[in-house]
C-alpha cells in the first residue's frame, strides 16, 4: 500500500453496491453497510427516531417505522424526481461522514460502480459526490477488483453482486465499453426465483424476499448438492420445516447460462492468441462468489470455449473496495484535477 504523505488528504475507496456499500480509508477504517435510506412513515416514526432519516443497517433495523429507499433502482441511479436524488445525496453524505475526515482535510475518493451505469448516471453521481469530496473518480467495480487481486492483465473478472453480474476483461489499462458486459441477473434475481419456486412447491408458506434471501445465504449451491437445505418457515403463523434443496439449486443455477454467454462475448474481445491463457485465469468476486460449487460449475458452463480455470478471490466481498482505495492512493494528487 502506498503511504499517504499528504496529511491534508484522506483517500477513500468505495464499492457502491445495490445491496451493500463498502468503504475503506487511508487511515485503515473499513466498514460495510446496507445501501438503504429510511424516511419516517408518519409523526410516530419521526418522534421515535428524532431524525429526518436513517441510513444503512440502522434503517433496516428500524424498518417498521420507515419507508425504505435504495439509491439504486434496477442497479442504476434513479433520478426521476428531486426526492429520488435526495436519497442518493443523503446516502453519500452518510458514507463520507463514516470515513471520518478530519477538520480541514480534503477527501479524494474513488467509487467503484457497475459498468451498467449510464453516462447520465455517472454525471449525477459525480455531481452529488463532489458536494462532500474535493476530488472524485468513478471506475468499473470488476476492474478495481481485478487490480486488487493482482490480475491487471490477462484475466477475466466476474463480479456477482445483488442486482448485476459484471464481467471485465483485464488488459492492463482502464477498460473500454467493449471490454465489459453487465447482466441484471445476480443475487436479487436468484432471491425472486427461489421465492417463487418454494411457493410453487409449498403454496401455504409465508415467504417474502427477505426470507428467500436468508435461505439463499445459508444454503446457496450449484451443481451436486453438498448439504440438505432443510429450513424452518411459517405457515398460517405456525412453524413448519421444509426441504428446499432442489429449489435452492435451481434458483442459484438460473442466471449462469446467460452469464456464460456474456463471458464468451468478453473473451472474444481478447486477442485470439491470448484467449486460451485468459480462459485459464478467471476470478469470481462479489457476494455471489460465496455460492458453493461455483468454480467447477462455471468451468463446466465454459467448456465450449476450451479448458477454463475458475477461482474465487481471497476476499470476494472486499476486493473492489480495496482496489478503489489502492487506485485513489496511486494517483498523484496533482493529476486528480486532470481526470
UniProtKB/Swiss-Prot annotation:
Its main location: cytoplasm. Keywords: ATP-binding, Biomineralization, Cytoplasm, Cytoskeleton, Hydrolase, Nucleotide-binding. It is found in: Cytoplasm; Cytoplasm, Cytoskeleton. One of its GO terms (molecular function) is ATP binding. One of its GO terms (cellular component) is cytoskeleton. It catalyses: ATP + H2O = ADP + phosphate + H(+). ATP binds at residues 18-19, 74, 162-164, 216-220. It holds the Pfam family MreB_Mbl. Belongs to the FtsA/MreB family. MamK subfamily. It is an enzyme of class 3 (hydrolase). Its EC number is 3.6.1.-. It comes from Paramagnetospirillum magneticum (strain ATCC 700264 / AMB-1). Induction: Expressed during exponential phase in static growth conditions in the presence and absence of the mamK gene. Expressed during late exponential phase in the presence and absence of the mamK gene. Forms cytoplasmic filament polymers. Forms filaments with MamK. Changing residue 15 to N: Loss of ATPase activity. One of its GO terms (biological process) is magnetosome assembly. Disulfide bonds: none annotated. SUPFAM superfamilies: Actin-like ATPase domain. Disruption phenotype: About 40% reduction in magnetosome alignment; a double mamK-mamK-like deletion has a 65% reduction in magnetosome alignment. The single mamK-like deletion has no effect on MamK turnover rates. Protein with ATPase activity which forms pole-to-pole filaments in vivo, probably with MamK. Efficient filament formation requires MamK. Probably promotes turnover of MamK filaments, by providing a monomer pool. In vivo, in the absence of its paralog MamK, forms thin filaments from pole to pole. In vitro forms straight filaments and bundles in the absence of ATP. Filament formation is triggered by KCl and MgCl(2); polymerizes more slowly and makes thinner filaments than MamK. This is MamK-like protein.
Amino acid at each position: 500500500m502506498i503511504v499517504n504523505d499528504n496529511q491534508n488528504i484522506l483517500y477513500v475507496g468505495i464499492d457502491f453496491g445495490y445491496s451493500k456499500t463498502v468503504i475503506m480509508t487511508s487511515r485503515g477504517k473499513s466498514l460495510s453497510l446496507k445501501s438503504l435510506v429510511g424516511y419516517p412513515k408518519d409523526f410516530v416514526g419521526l418522534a421515535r427516531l428524532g431524525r429526518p432519516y436513517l441510513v444503512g443497517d440502522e434503517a433496516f433495523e428500524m424498518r417498521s417505522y420507515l419507508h425504505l429507499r435504495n439509491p439504486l433502482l434496477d442497479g442504476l441511479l434513479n433520478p426521476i424526481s428531486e426526492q429520488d436524488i435526495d436519497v442518493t445525496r443523503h446516502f453519500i453524505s452518510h458514507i463520507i461522514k463514516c470515513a471520518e475526515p478530519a477538520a480541514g482535510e480534503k477527501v479524494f475518493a474513488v467509487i467503484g460502480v457497475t459498468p451498467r451505469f449510464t453516462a447520465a448516471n455517472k454525471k449525477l453521481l459525480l455531481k452529488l459526490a463532489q458536494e462532500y469530496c474535493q476530488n472524485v473518480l468513478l471506475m468499473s467495480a470488476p476492474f478495481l477488483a481485478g487490480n486488487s487481486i493482482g490480475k491487471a492483465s490477462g484475466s477475466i473478472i466476474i463480479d456477482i453482486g445483488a442486482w448485476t453480474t459484471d464481467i471485465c476483461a483485464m488488459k492492463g489499462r482502464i477498460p473500454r465499453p467493449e471490454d465489459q458486459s453487465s447482466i441484471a441477473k445476480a443475487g436479487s434475481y436468484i432471491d425472486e426465483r427461489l421465492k417463487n419456486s418454494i411457493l410453487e412447491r409449498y403454496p401455504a408458506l409465508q415467504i417474502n424476499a427477505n426470507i428467500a434471501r436468508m435461505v439463499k445465504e445459508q444454503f446457496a449451491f450449484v451443481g451436486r448438492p453438498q448439504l440438505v437445505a432443510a429450513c424452518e418457515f411459517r405457515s398460517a403463523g405456525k412453524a413448519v420445516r421444509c426441504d428446499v434443496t432442489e429449489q435452492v439449486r435451481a434458483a442459484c443455477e438460473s442466471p449462469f447460462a446467460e452469464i456464460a454467454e456474456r463471458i464468451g462475448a468478453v473473451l472474444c474481445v481478447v486477442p485470439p492468441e491470448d484467449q486460451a491463457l485468459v480462459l485459464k485465469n478467471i476470478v469470481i468476486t462479489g457476494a455471489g462468489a460465496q455460492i458453493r460449487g461455483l468454480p467447477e460449475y462455471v468451468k463446466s458452463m465454459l467448456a465450449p470455449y476450451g479448458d477454463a480455470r475458475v477461482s474465487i478471490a481471497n476476499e470476494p466481498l472486499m476486493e473492489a473496495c480495496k482496489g478503489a482505495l489502492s487506485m485513489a492512493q496511486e494517483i498523484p494528487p496533482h493529476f486528480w484535477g486532470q481526470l
